[in-house]
């Protein structure tokens, strides 16, 4: 991308890579070092939802880019948890024109293996009570000149191999067609065994 003069902003998921694993004080529990997204449920409070930790950094960075630069389009790509973030964030911010989720999520009815259940953010009932994955896929794809592509690794060593994705691809495409704008596509890569 850089060779083609694209500007690239790279981010990592909470608690991963350059992000720290803080020690937090939780009422009634004491100090806990956060090492896993599964612990984020412990941070839930009346005035704070840990889901913000996944999407707010994207919003802050996108707002900065929009203020400081004159880009015509914004694209977003994410792998695994970043693929999940790509689905959710592009569903709520129409500034994302092209979104590519790689091994990032699957509808709940396809999660029949423990390895596909996902972390806190993947199964947070407060979010999915209001909007399910199929609706998130529609929202990610819907809009003028907007595209959402799901990419699955057929022989994925981790999760979300894309098996069963054909059961909903036509549903999403049909809904996008009814709405009259947007594009949705699924691509299953069978060329490797990696995540």
Give the residues covered by each predicted segment.
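Structured alpha-helical segments in the cores of large, soluble enzyme domains
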Residues: 54-63, 135-142
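Primarily recognizes the serine-hydrolase "nucleophile elbow" in alpha/beta-hydrolase
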Residues: 59-120
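Histidine-bearing beta->alpha loop at or near hydrolase active sites
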Residues: 155-157, 181-195
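Solvent-exposed loop/turn segments at secondary-structure junctions
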Residues: 14-18, 81-83, 105-108, 154-158
